[in-house]
């Protein structure tokens, strides 16, 4: 497994170094949804931990939303094999979003409640950094969502400090493309937990993903061009620690 992960972990390390995501003594939790992105991030950080010059602690936290049929037992078993502390917290987020509030835009409230539950769990454990599985394609999609639906040039930052919680969010996979992640997750036979959310393929983000994929079939470098434009502006928070141009995926 380590041999297969070497190249991918190198991509992760580039982002970590470019944005000084990891410092000596950090206590890092990976927000594990059960999807391929967060599971591969967990494996890559565990691999990086074995040789990175700065020591950091690593654990995994899952916020269980309350959908029937989601079994995180295989995720717990993977964490046991890797000797990574794992916490799975049950919540009623699904019930609140779909049954109580009956939201027209459920994704926004769900994300807000997930973040709140994660931040609470992190504070209780003395963790100072939360690693999220957003990748290269997520960044491009978020930028296009902001441009097309809000009229703004905006995207999440590689590193974000949250004043209210005192937690720093890091996104070590911003240089990793979704296709590479999907292929590697299959090769490693990661225990992916399928998401039964009815909005999983009915959101604006999914529409943008489909649009970008359609355009990329005709213009293969399109996503890289968009990502490069984000870097060259640069968007707030996308400056590297030494002022160099970020290296992209």
PLM features: residue spans?
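ATP-dependent adenylation/nucleotidyltransferase module used to activate substrates
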Residues: 1-141, 145, 149-152, 179-187
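Generic structural signal for well-ordered, non-membrane alpha-helical segments
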Residues: 5, 111, 201-204, 208, ...
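A short, amphipathic alpha-helical segment
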Residues: 13, 17, 46, 213-216, ...
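Alpha-helix boundary/capping and short turn/kink residues
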Residues: 21, 201, 216-220, 235
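Catalytic subdomain that performs nucleotidyl-dependent activation
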Residues: 57-58, 137-217
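Glycine-rich beta-alpha junction loops
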Residues: 65, 199, 230
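Short, basic, helix/turn surface patches
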Residues: 111-123, 159-165, 212, 216-231
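A short, charged, Gly/Pro-tolerant segment at domain boundaries
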Residues: 221-249
């Amino acid at each position: 497994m380590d041999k297969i992960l070497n190249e991918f972990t190198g991509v992760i390390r580039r982002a970590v170094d470019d944005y000084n995501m990891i410092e000596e003594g950090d206590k890092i939790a990976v927000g594990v949804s059960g999807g391929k992105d967060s599971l591969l991030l967990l494996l890559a950080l565990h691999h990086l931990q074995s040789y990175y010059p700065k020591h950091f602690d690593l654990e995994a936290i899952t916020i269980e939303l309350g959908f029937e049929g989601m079994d995180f037992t295989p995720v717990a078993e993977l964490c046991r094999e890797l000797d990574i502390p794992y916490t799975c917290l049950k919540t009623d987020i699904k019930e609140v979003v779909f049954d109580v509030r009956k939201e027209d835009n459920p994704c926004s409230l769900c994300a807000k409640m997930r973040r709140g539950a994660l931040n609470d769990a992190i504070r209780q454990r003395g963790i100072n950094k939360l690693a999220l599985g957003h990748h290269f394609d997520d960044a491009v999609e978020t930028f296009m969502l902001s441009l097309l639906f809000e009229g703004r040039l905006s995207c999440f930052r590689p590193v974000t400090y949250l004043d209210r919680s005192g937690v720093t969010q890091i996104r070590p996979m911003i240089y990793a493309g979704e296709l590479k992640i999907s292929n590697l997750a299959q090769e490693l036979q990661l225990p992916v937990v399928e998401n039964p959310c009815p909005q999983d393929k009915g959101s604006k983000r999914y529409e943008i993903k489909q649009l970008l994929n359609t355009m990329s079939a005709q213009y293969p470098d399109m996503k890289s061009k968009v990502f490069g434009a984000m870097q060259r502006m640069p968007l707030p928070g996308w400056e590297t620690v030494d002022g160099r141009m970020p290296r992209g995926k």
